[in-house]
A protein has these predicted regions:
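Glycine-rich cofactor phosphate-binding loops and adjacent beta1-alpha1 units
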Residues: 163, 188, 205-279
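Short glycine-centered segments of the SAM/dcSAM-binding site in methyltransferase folds
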Residues: 81, 170, 260-261
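Short Gly/Pro-enriched turn/cap motifs at secondary-structure boundaries
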Residues: 7, 19-20, 53-59, 113-118, ...
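Mid-domain Rossmann-like dinucleotide-binding core that forms the NAD(H)/NADP(H) cofactor-binding site
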Residues: 136-225
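Glycine-rich beta-strand-centered segment in the early N-terminal region that forms part
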Residues: 20-35, 48-97, 138-141
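Cytochrome P450 core scaffold surrounding the K-helix E-X-X-R motif
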Residues: 40-46
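NAD(P)H dinucleotide-binding glycine-rich loop of Rossmann-like/cofactor-binding domains
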Residues: 92-174
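Short, flexible surface segments
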Residues: 75-78, 167, 258
Length: 281
């Protein structure tokens, strides 16, 4: 089958590989019907994901049809349309039982697909722990609609969940790409007092104005002053940084009030340094 493969830093190639087979009784084989590119794939290409293994098929955002299942898989069957979770997790270790599935201690736990084991930029993919990592797609939901569920929407949901958002809060979201919009949708479920989205792309700003007219928007250059003028305590109560640039990492702290919650949703190509306290709000 054709696969898109991480060869070395800066180099991906379309390569021929054998179809995957069941290795563990908890595995499933999924025929990929639709996949998308994540910015994390670009971080792998840039060499900024240390655990990424050269030679693996990249891709962790996909939907498909279950082709085969191991003997211990009970939640899905061949022929089911499914989303594939970016995280593979055993569901049994300490971290899984406490909801921190990204830290699953199994060798295939956490972000394995498309990073440490072959992922979904291929015709077929083997999914470990299929009962945890596959979800059936309802008949009325298209593959295109479901494609966001396994990673981008789940990332936004998790970010909103851990940010302890309260109804009296001013929430700043930095970045309005696909993950930023999904984060916005999940933050809206928390009903904070106001939501501000910082974005430089005019098309993305227009999209927010058309679909979510109640949301405030601001450019990065004006963001710090705008947030201070449109918040109750000299800065945002909660900041979610989804853009992933060095400048936006710094901006997150500049816009946060004292004792705010800053949630880093993005990945970065290099280590970031917290700004000096004197230079922020």
């Amino acid at each position: 089958m054709q696969t898109y493969t991480y060869v070395s830093k800066g180099k991906f190639e379309l390569m021929e590989k054998p179809n995957p087979v069941l290795i563990d009784e908890r595995d499933a084989i999924v025929k990929v019907t639709l996949a998308s590119i994540c910015s994390s794939d670009l971080h792998i290409k840039h060499g900024s994901v240390p655990r990424a293994v050269p030679g693996i098929t990249v891709g962790h955002e996909m939907v498909g049809i279950v082709e085969d299942i191991g003997s211990a898989v009970t939640n899905v069957k061949p022929g089911d349309r499914v989303t594939v979770n970016v995280e593979t997790f055993c569901g049994e270790c300490f971290f899984c039982r406490h909801g921190y599935v990204n830290n699953c201690t199994d060798q295939n736990g956490g972000w394995a697909l498309g990073c440490r084991i072959d992922g979904g930029q291929a015709e077929y993919v083997r999914v470990p722990f299929a009962d945890q990592g596959l979800n059936k797609i309802p008949d009325h939901v298209t593959d295109r609609q479901a494609l966001l569920v396994g990673d981008v929407l789940a990332t936004g949901f998790w970010a909103a969940r851990i940010s302890e958002i309260k109804e009296e809060d001013t929430v700043l979201i930095i970045g309005a790409g696909p993950t930023g919009i999904c984060t916005l949708l999940c933050v809206m479920l928390k009903n904070p007092k106001r939501i501000i989205v910082c974005e430089k792309d005019k098309g993305r700003i227009r999209f927010i104005h058309e679909h979510y007219p109640e949301i405030l928007t601001v450019s990065p250059e004006a963001c710090a002053d705008y947030v201070r003028a449109n918040s109750d305590h000299g800065g945002a109560d909660v900041v979610l940084e989804v853009a992933g640039a060095e400048s936006t990492f710094r901006l997150a702290w500049e816009c946060a009030r004292p004792n705010a919650i800053v949630t880093i949703v993005a990945l970065y190509d290099k280590a970031q340094t917290l700004p000096d306290r004197k230079s922020v709000v």
